[in-house]
């Protein structure tokens, strides 16, 4: 017991000093009390430090937008296994000279990403060359077609399997691959191209949005333009779109059907050469019910084509635009698809908060408030397959003046409804519907078909029943406008004056491009069926595709702005109508107290329409008709030279017009009233004469003679008949005769090499005629889609056209002696006539004889 008490007391004694010490310490050192030790906070990673405070959004990868307007991508491993489309679009601009709001500044292109421990690399994959995955040459192919690196982005940090990179500069600076400025080679000049240097102090990334399939980045870029350092500011929207893991099955192109396409090369050990082929551009339409589709039933597509119509369109035109979009349903129905294309209004924020007309996911019909009289319909593709990913129609405000002028000069003599400065809405809707449908045709893959209208006869175009069914052309993708062949009284008989809603060729082309081929598993397996569809229509000229020609028209059967297969009669009938308009338009367009500016402009439209008809006859001189033939077919000619009879007819037609057009188109009293410069009307006559001596045309006449084809002109016969037609004029000379003969002597002196002075005259004339052609062709709705311009070269996009720049020239040893001989013939004609005619004629003959004698002596 005592032992237990002792032990307890000792335990207390041992404890008390401890508590006391603590108490003393607390008492004496209370002012210096230390806080209990805590664990030091963990230092933030560089990843977290960089993105702190940034707005985060999730898309194909994570995107951060910092308070300093920086953009950062956090990319998981999965992002490096996919491919994307990168686009650059003008969302707003301070100057519409080069591009308008809503327009792509560059063609979207394929990209992918790779990484190492230092950088993330932005590649532009090679798409122009292909190889089969199991071909033994694949290792060599990959080494020789390595995907180039467009940009490298240093890795900021890595976290949770994601690498962080800063891409701000790429979207804030003047990155050449997505620049809004057009980059031209030093040898090329274009007055519409804006040149300038980026002003980094006035350029910034303004907004970033992410969605499951895409990232949208807006930047404000400001340039100081040259040479005056004026500011040029744009809001650019760049899209990065995640592409399907498995590309759409491609379809092979055929020149007998006009579909936009991309060129490719195929490397294989199974072939003795590198094969070239083209894949067409089309939307990926797949039936909701494949079994029903294959039974021939109309089936809705899984994903229809949807166009959103700009909310700023005037209400009176909006329904017409939507109607024109959905007019193409009849073509898709021929391919087995119901409701394949849909027109919708721009949705409100309540209806679709994610809608953005500049987002690459949305295809839109956009309104551009500019003075340009045009419209265009580009589409943008996945270059791996040709699948159209998105498309736009850019509708320029002043397109109304374009269609107004067409209707007035082409049908004003026949249709009283168009004899006014402002059309009734009903009439304007007819024309707007055609233009809108034409542009939508481009967005679904169709190229211009310039040969379509050649399949109709004059009689067809004046037949009420025929025109009500077929309009003016089998394809609205032709530049065949209104029925200028129709004569007064034809409208009352029921003749249609406008193009069809959709042409029969257009329906055929959509069927060929979009109808699924039963049983085919590859593009190669589709070919027999596709060829059979073409063969079914081979003997019907309505289904012939006529390729556009560039830069010159040498095939008279594939022309722009023409109607019928008889350009001579069509021209005569339209010119007869133009004379009626010229005689009456000052009364029809009378606006009391107004200036004559509008009337002068409309006279310019008359000249443009007249020049179109002249231009339709010029290609017959030395002309060539082209055919798309295949081995094994009966017709083995890919080209046929225009016959002597047609060329002679063209020669006489042009000379007759050159002698007579001033009598009605350049009536002095009218020109003086409206202050119209007669210099341009004078150039019309010179253009006709120059066409008869054109070296390219002369060269093709010579080539035809060498070809052995029957019925062609011999060059000497052409020259003899031309000189007779120009210089052997009965009776007194008119002013037009003297002008024609003087120019003919100039041109022969120049092209024979006998006169340096005449060479200079011919060169100046060529420049003047180029300017005239450009001026009078401004209202031809270029669409920005002709001759390979549909897409930029980055994705290999193309359109089938005939290159006509390198026509064979007649050798100098042939042409020079021939022209010298003809000049001597002219001398003889003048000597025989110098004592005849009136005083003006005799003076003219004396002058020309003196001129020719000096020319001969000098040489």
Residue locations for each model-derived region?
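Bacterial Sec-dependent N-terminal signal peptides
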Residues: 1-26
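Zn2+-dependent metallopeptidase catalytic core
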Residues: 80-81, 316-340
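Sec-exported extracytoplasmic/periplasmic mature domains
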Residues: 326-337, 441-442, 446, 482, ...
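Extended catalytic-interface subdomain
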Residues: 376, 381, 387-395, 433-444, ...
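Conserved catalytic/binding loops enriched for acidic/polar residues
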Residues: 453-859
